[in-house]
């Protein structure tokens, strides 16, 4: 190790000069090994976030000492391994253009990674040999992904390879975990999310166990619709026996998930969905629990995620019961006796007798025919749901009718379930010409477009367009585990572009979450994201053709995503003027009018945007997750790579500006668990801006969601954060979200640790809620 090793890494050679105690670190350098020095610097993060930056640079230096010094050499060494994962075609492309790739790649950019980022890359994304030795650097991985996207087709597009590498390595965009895992390999399953619909026959029940296991082994996350499975004790005419219902089947999928881990890199990840009218609903709601009768008898399935597919009719009955306007009566059915309830939805929310409400009509038809197998109340169901949420943070809630009526692909078929993180909504079915939904994900770093004079909406639009083209190419270049997944992806060509770093944008511009300015900017950012994606998808359609299911879609009729919200009455028609004002004329009424006219001629992709969790991307780049507020100003992030201290650098910079980042403040911040609300030496304006997600009124999160949702083609992973498990508080935001037309009611509901006997249960809930659903996690 060179004499001035620490001084060099802390200097501006690798970016900005770091605010660290060099004398202290020089002494530590003498005493510690390199790995110990990394841990030592990480532990000092509480003093200043630059210590974490230095630890990251040390970790990068450590990796660079043990890996090849050029991209082509790294590929050659991997290809020479007896069990190399690299595809021969990929290796040939690298060798053919190695002079270009080797001269363009910039390994100094590795030093821009956060500590959490470089350790995550080492643990999960960088290719290893059969002995577990890392064989590449982060920049090599970014170039590998870029070549996979633009170098594996009929034409090797060098220009787009280099552009995509730049966008990835500068952390302007990120691609999903399966893309990072599998790009350039012999079996490149690049897709993140898969949606399966389980039919009520023995052959298909077991087929779906096999299919889910194969998908999971390639790194995909899975959402399964169970609403079509007949209820427990239902008669099976073919055998004369009685059905076991959904319980044993869920346990079977639970065991399959535990076995079929994602390439050994992380656990498998499945979510199961059920509609609320199903006779087995109370069994379903108890199966995730860590405590209770099923758990004690080991009849639960706590490793799965759970989701409810909630119709408007249930919410109407629940609201009436809450306000004593009705008795809350809710009928339960077995789908063999009351078929197709999960295959219809209400096109309108109106109470008018002539309203298009196919679900409501069929539901009450079956009630009149006395096909129901049980009667409960809406309150009883929601209380059972909440009891489970307290323990494990889910089941998620997806608003079935809003999802379907606002889908560009509503003409294809009813959307019966979502994916692992409830942001992907693709129709899927089994049987003749079965389709199993697939979506490829990526995200844009919103903080990359912060400028001294405001926000660069034009840059965001351009980046969104670039990601659109990337994902469209991934559809053609990826591996599909089943013919039904290939058929669906080729027919609809759905993509899901998300975001991360919204909280960083607000913090940098000194905007408070929940303020009118913040809500307007949230809307404008997602409008720009959608606009950029749609514009590029239209251009791609002119070049390559529209997706085959384009005829009959909303876009084919000149309806953009926000137009579907206007049609439903959930967005006022003047939204265009509001967006024009916020973007300072970047997006005007004319912009949207021209986009509508162009869309009628053809669109390449059936879906464009979906707001997923982005913990890994956020970890890698040092930005906050997706569209969420800061969860804390100081916390320990636990990942598969270890534990890391995360400090809110924007808060520290603001406090340093007024000479308040002192040892006393540091100690108070530590003792308060990352909250500054009771540190009265800090000005009220700063305390207000740095309220954490738990400290702000949860209606703020709902209002922000309502502002961005009209520009989301699919849905979003919308979390809520509460101090105490009070059903009234949770119901308030759920009902508000439903009334505002949200597609996702809730992803996870997080609760702070409580007191007494509840404390352990809620701590378990926190553990479950914070577990990374990394299949669609970026």
Curated annotation (Swiss-Prot):
Entry keyword Ubl conjugation: no
Active site, per annotation: 419, 421, 423
GO molecular function (one): ribonucleoside-diphosphate reductase activity, thioredoxin disulfide as acceptor
Q: Name one Pfam family in it.
A: Ribonuc_red_lgN
Q: Which cysteines are joined by disulfide bonds?
A: 193-439
UniProt keywords (A-Z) are:
Allosteric enzyme, ATP-binding, Deoxyribonucleotide synthesis, Disulfide bond, Early protein, Nucleotide-binding, Oxidoreductase
Q: What induces it?
A: Expressed in the early phase of the viral replicative cycle.
> According to UniProt, where does the site described as Interacts with thioredoxin/glutaredoxin lie?
773, 776
Q: Which GO terms describe its biological process?
A: deoxyribonucleotide biosynthetic process
Activity control note: Under complex allosteric control mediated by deoxynucleoside triphosphates and ATP binding. The type of nucleotide bound at the specificity site determines substrate preference. It seems probable that ATP makes the enzyme reduce CDP and UDP, dGTP favors ADP reduction and dTTP favors GDP reduction.
The residues annotated as site (Important for electron transfer) are 747-748
The reaction(s) catalysed by this protein are:
a 2'-deoxyribonucleoside 5'-diphosphate + [thioredoxin]-disulfide + H2O = a ribonucleoside 5'-diphosphate + [thioredoxin]-dithiol
* Positions bearing the site annotation: Important for hydrogen atom transfer: 193, 439
**What EC number(s) does the entry state?**
1.17.4.1
- Give the InterPro entries listed for this entry: NrdE_NrdA_C, RNR_lg_C, RNR_lsu_N, RNR_R1-su_N, Rrm1
Q: What is the protein's quaternary organization?
A: Heterotetramer composed of a homodimer of the large subunit (R1) and a homodimer of the small subunit (R2). Larger multisubunit protein complex are also active, composed of (R1)n(R2)n.
UniProt lists the family membership as follows: Belongs to the ribonucleoside diphosphate reductase large chain family.
This chain belongs to the protein called Ribonucleoside-diphosphate reductase large subunit
């Amino acid at each position: 190790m060179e004499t001035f090793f620490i001084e060099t890494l802390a200097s501006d050679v690798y970016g900005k000069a770091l605010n660290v105690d060099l004398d202290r670190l020089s002494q530590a350098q003498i005493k510690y090994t390199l790995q110990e020095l990394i841990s030592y610097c990480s532990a000092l993060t509480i003093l200043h976030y630059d210590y974490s930056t230095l630890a990251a640079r040390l970790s990068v230096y450590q990796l660079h000492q043990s890996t090849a010094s050029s991209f082509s050499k790294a590929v050659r060494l991997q290809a020479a391994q007896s069990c190399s994962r690299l595809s021969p075609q990929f290796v040939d492309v690298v060798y053919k253009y190695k002079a270009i790739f080797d001269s363009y790649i910039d390994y100094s950019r590795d030093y821009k990674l956060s500590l959490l980022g470089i350790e995550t890359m080492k643990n999960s994304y960088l290719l290893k040999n059969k002995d577990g030795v890392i064989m590449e650097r982060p920049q090599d991985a970014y170039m590998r992904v870029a070549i996979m996207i633009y170098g594996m087709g009929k034409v090797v597009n060098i220009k787009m390879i280099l552009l995509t590498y730049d966008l990835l390595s500068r952390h302007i965009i990120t691609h999903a975990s399966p893309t990072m895992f599998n790009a350039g390999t012999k079996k490149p399953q690049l897709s993140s999310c898969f949606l399966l619909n389980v039919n009520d026959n023995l052959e298909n029940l077991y087929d779906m166990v096999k299919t889910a296991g194969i998908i999971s082994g390639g790194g995909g996350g899975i959402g399964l619709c169970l609403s079509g499975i007949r209820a427990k004790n239902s008669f099976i005419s073919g055998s004369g026996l009685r059905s076991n219902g959904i319980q044993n089947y869920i346990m079977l999928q639970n065991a399959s998930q535990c076995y079929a881990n994602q390439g050994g890199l992380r656990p498998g990840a499945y979510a199961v969905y059920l509609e609320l009218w199903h006779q087995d609903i109370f069994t379903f709601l108890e199966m995730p629990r860590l405590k209770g009768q099923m758990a004690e008898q080991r009849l639960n399935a706590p490793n799965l995620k759970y989701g409810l597919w909630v119709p408007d009719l249930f919410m109407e009955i629940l609201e009436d019961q809450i306000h004593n306007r009705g008795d809350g009566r809710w009928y339960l059915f077995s789908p063999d006796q009351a078929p197709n309830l999960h295959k219809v939805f209400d096109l309108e929310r109106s109470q008018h007798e002539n309203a298009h409400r196919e679900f409501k009509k069929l539901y009450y038809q079956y009630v009149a025919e006395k096909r129901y197998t049980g009667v409960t109340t809406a309150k009883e169901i929601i209380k059972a749901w909440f009891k489970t949420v307290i323990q494990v943070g889910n089941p998620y809630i997806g608003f079935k009718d809003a999802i379907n009526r606002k889908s560009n692909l509503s003409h294809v078929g009813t959307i019966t379930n979502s994916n692992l993180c409830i942001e992907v909504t693709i129709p899927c079915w089994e049987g003749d010409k079965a389709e199993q939904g697939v979506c490829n994900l990526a995200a844009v770093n919103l903080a990359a477009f912060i400028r001294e004079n405001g926000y660069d909406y034009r840059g965001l639009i351009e980046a969104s367009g670039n990601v659109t083209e990337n994902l469209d190419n991934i559809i053609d270049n990826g591996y599909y585990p089943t013919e039904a997944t290939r058929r669906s992806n080729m027919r609809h060509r759905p993509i899901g572009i998300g975001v991360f770093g919204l909280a960083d944008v607000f913090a940098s511009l000194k905007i408070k979450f929940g303020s009118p300015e913040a809500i307007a900017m949230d809307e404008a950012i997602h409008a720009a994201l959608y606009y950029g994606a749609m514009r590029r998808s239209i251009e791609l359609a002119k070049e390559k053709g529209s997706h085959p299911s384009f005829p009959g879609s909303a876009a084919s009729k000149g309806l953009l995503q926000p137009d579907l919200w206007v049609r439903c009455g959930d967005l006022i028609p003047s939204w265009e003027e509001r967006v024009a004002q916020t973007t300072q004329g970047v997006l005007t009424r004319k912009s949207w009018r021209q986009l509508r006219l162009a869309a009628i001629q053809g669109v390449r992709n059936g879906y464009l945007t979906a707001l997923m969790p982005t913990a890994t991307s956020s970890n890698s780049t040092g930005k906050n997750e997706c569209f969420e507020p800061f969860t804390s100003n100081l916390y320990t992030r636990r990942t598969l790579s270890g534990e890391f201290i995360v400090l809110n650098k924007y808060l520290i910079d603001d406090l340093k500006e007024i000479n308040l980042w002192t040892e006393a403040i540091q100690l108070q911040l530590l003792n308060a668990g990352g909250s500054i609300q009771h540190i009265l030496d800090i000005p009220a304006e700063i305390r207000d801006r740095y309220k954490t997600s738990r400290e702000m009124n949860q209606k703020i999160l709902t209002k922000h969601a309502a502002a961005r949702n009209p520009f989301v083609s699919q849905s979003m992973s919308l979390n809520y954060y509460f101090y105490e498990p009070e059903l009234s508080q949770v119901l308030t935001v759920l009902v508000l979200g439903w009334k505002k037309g949200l597609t996702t009611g809730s992803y996870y509901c997080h609760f702070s640790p409580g007191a007494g006997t509840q404390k352990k249960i809620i701590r378990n809930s926190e553990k479950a809620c914070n577990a990374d659903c990394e299949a669609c996690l970026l």
